[in-house]
Amino acid sequence: TLEASSAASDVYKRQTHINEIAGDSNAAAHLLEFDSVHGRWGKDIEVKEEEIIIEEKKLAYTSFKNYLDVPWEKSSVDIILECTGKNKKPDKLNPYFDSLGMKRVIVACPVKGIVAGEESLNIVYGINQSLYDPSKHKLVTAASCTTNCLAPIVKVINENFSIKHGAITTIHDVTNTQVPVDFYKSDLRRARG
């Protein structure tokens, strides 16, 4: 729903398609309008078969589990926001370029390995964004939330006092992959509430 709210702003006029595997367009429109974190969104939202219309801006909406099956070309998509958390390895990301011909893929989690012919660049703004070269980096990621919190502090401490070695402990907020109460999961640690 965050992508859809961005699509209705003047900044992101190019957004044309959402592929959400978790639910249909009616559920997405409802979650967009009634957001538990940001409150009620005061935009006109309408749902038609495979579209969400926000303030007259039409967004194609599909729910394909395999992104290679999504009709991206119908919506003239050339930049993908990969936010499933499932496609974070080169073998899952390279088909965006090799099979679908995407210009750019922006991944919402850290990525390791060679993608689209280059080592993945995990950017932490204010730390290493100068390494980004648009002529060679087709895949971009903003690293992890923990890295984004830690890197600026480590940079300042290291530049002023020199860090020889260190260890961190992080207390992370609840995520969508965790359960509020104990439940059966293949990862027994994450099965605990």
Predicted regions and their residues:
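Single conserved hydrophobic/aromatic residue that forms the stacking wall/gate
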Residues: T1-A8, Y12
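Active-site-lining helix/loop region of Rossmann-like oxidoreductase modules
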Residues: K13-R14, E46-V47, S135, A151-G193
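Glycine-rich phosphate-binding loop and adjoining beta1-alpha1-beta2 segment
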Residues: R14-I54
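Short, well-ordered coil/turn residues at beta-beta hairpins
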Residues: I21, L81-C83, A108
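Glycine-rich beta-alpha junction loops
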Residues: I21-D24, V111-K112, S144-T146, T170-T177
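A structured beta-alpha segment of the ubiquitous adenosine-cofactor-binding alpha/beta core
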Residues: H38-D91, P134
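Rossmann-fold NAD(P)-binding glycine/threonine-rich loop
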Residues: K86-H137
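Short alpha-helices
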Residues: H137-I153
